[in-house]
């Protein structure tokens, strides 16, 4: 009887040790960002990350993620990611300036059109203001698309993501089109309002079909406030100098 008790105690000890090792390895994997998320920054334009993670988009929303990178300060490349609540990122992105947008396989001698829109205005369940135009730039050289320096003819100034309260996650979509020799502009009516923009009609007008590349990220309104938010513009200036 005593031997059976000893054997049972030994088995329980081994089981507990195995469980502890398993939990330790799981914790280590999470700390390294595997699986289920990616640390902000990642050694690319951006920065600290401070220990929070960028969750990947749901499977149903990854079809647009095609070889286009979108870098915001602190977070790094957020292509195909969800902006996390940690580090006030959902607040900060509403005040940061335009991101670095890189298309590594752009053609050096070509001109490109960059489009950034929100198809979920005012909400994904009721997108009556689809598409909300956040950024529109034509005549971007292939070299600038490769470097991420978006210069050209600005048809709509960059407007940061500002999803309304209680509307859930919004998709912010980026499309890059090969412009060719097209002279692209907005009509008087289009210039008058950012919301309810007929993107399909605009593309048809200039014979633009499938984008050469595209991506999207998601974010939503965050009600938390912090004094740290006041330092965003200073951080942005440092980011622009990188």
From Swiss-Prot:
Chief subcellular location: secreted
Say if the entry is tagged with keyword Signal: yes
Glycan-modified residues: 77, 139
- List keywords of the entry alphabetically: Glycoprotein, Secreted, Signal
What CDD domains does this protein's entry cite? PEBP_euk (cd00866)
Location comes to: Secreted
Of the GO CC terms on this record, one is: extracellular region
Pfam family name, one: PBP
Region Important for secretion: list its residue ranges. Answer: 210-242
Checking InterPro entries in the record gives: PEBP, PEBP-like_sf, PEBP_euk, Phosphatidylethanolamine-bd_CS
Q: Where is the composition biased (Gly residues)?
A: 38-50
For the region Disordered, give the residue spans. Answer: 31-50
Q: Could you tell me the superkingdom of the organism this chain comes from?
A: Eukaryota
Q: What does this protein do?
A: Promotes AKT phosphorylation, suggesting a possible role in the PI3K-AKT signaling pathway.
* Similarity comment: Belongs to the phosphatidylethanolamine-binding protein family.
The protein depicted here goes by the name Phosphatidylethanolamine-binding protein 4
């Amino acid at each position: 009887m005593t031997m059976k008790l000893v054997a049972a105690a030994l088995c329980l000890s081994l089981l507990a040790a195995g469980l502890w090792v398993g939990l330790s390895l799981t914790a280590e994997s999470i700390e390294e960002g595997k699986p289920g998320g990616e640390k902000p920054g990642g050694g690319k334009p951006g920065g600290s990350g401070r220990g929070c993670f960028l969750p990947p988009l749901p499977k149903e929303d990854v079809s647009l993620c095609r070889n286009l990178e979108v870098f915001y300060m602190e977070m790094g490349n957020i292509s195909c990611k969800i902006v996390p609540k940690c580090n006030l990122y959902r607040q900060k992105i509403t005040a940061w300036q335009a991101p670095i947008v890189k298309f590594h396989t752009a053609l050096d001698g070509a001109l490109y059109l960059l489009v950034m829109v929100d198809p979920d205005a005012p909400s994904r369940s009721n997108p009556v203001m689809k598409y909300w135009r956040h950024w529109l730039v034509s005549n971007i050289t292939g070299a600038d698309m490769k470097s991420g320096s978006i210069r050209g003819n600005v048809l709509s100034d960059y407007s940061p993501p500002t999803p309304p309260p209680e509307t859930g996650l919004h998709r912010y979509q980026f499309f890059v089109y090969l412009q060719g020799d097209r002279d692209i502009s907005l009509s008087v009516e289009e210039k008058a309002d950012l919301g309810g923009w007929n993107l399909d009609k605009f593309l048809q007008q200039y014979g633009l079909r499938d984008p050469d590349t595209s991506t999207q990220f998601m974010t939503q309104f965050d009600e938390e406030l912090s004094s740290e938010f006041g330092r965003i513009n200073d951080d942005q200036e440092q980011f622009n100098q990188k």
